[in-house]
């Protein structure tokens, strides 16, 4: 077991660096019914269950940005956040609906089970989608043997 500790430590470091350096997920802008440019941004596309005490994300911030034809932020539009129906009982959005302020509507996504979920944000008859992976908390290095 002792000879595996450095290898496990190295693997943990690679995991930490890869998630810390992962870029934000950004959907390209699309035009809405009223000509607004709508985009979706996700802070973490990989989150972990029960990772408290570790430097691993347990939730993801989801941001919808809405701009007019001149690129100015659009305020006051309702944005509804949701997940595919099979995940409805296993995820949360806080809040589930928000209005744009300074051109942005934000929510915090969380889940209570592992897997891959497609999330959606709907604004002005446009739906933007993203995929978030939820994994179990990694086992501590050297644990169990």
Question: Where in the sequence are the language-model features?
Answer:
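Hydrophobic beta-strand segments
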Residues: 78-81
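Short, intrinsically disordered, low-complexity terminal segments
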Residues: 17-19, 95, 118, 127
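Short, acidic Ser/Thr/Gly-rich low-complexity loop/linker segments typical of extracellular
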Residues: 94-102
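Short, hydrophobic beta-strand segments
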Residues: 105-113
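Short, conserved secondary-structure segments in the cores of folded domains
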Residues: 50, 95-96, 107
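Short S/T/G/P-enriched beta-strand
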Residues: 21-74, 85-91, 113, 122-145
């Amino acid at each position: 077991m002792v000879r595996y500790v450095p290898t496990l430590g190295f693997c943990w470091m690679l995991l930490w660096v890869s998630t810390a350096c992962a870029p934000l997920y950004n959907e390209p802008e699309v035009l809405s019914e009223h000509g607004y440019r709508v985009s979706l941004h996700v802070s973490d596309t990989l989150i972990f269950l029960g990772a408290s005490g570790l430097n691993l994300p347990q939730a993801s911030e989801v941001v919808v940005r809405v701009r007019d034809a001149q690129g100015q932020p659009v305020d006051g539009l309702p944005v509804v956040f949701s997940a595919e129906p099979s995940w409805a009982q296993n995820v949360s959005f806080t809040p589930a609906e928000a209005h744009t302020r300074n051109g942005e509507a934000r929510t915090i996504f969380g889940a209570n089970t592992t897997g891959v979920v497609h999330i959606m944000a709907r604004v002005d008859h446009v739906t933007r989608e993203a995929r978030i992976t939820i994994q179990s908390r990694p086992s501590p290095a050297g644990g169990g043997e």
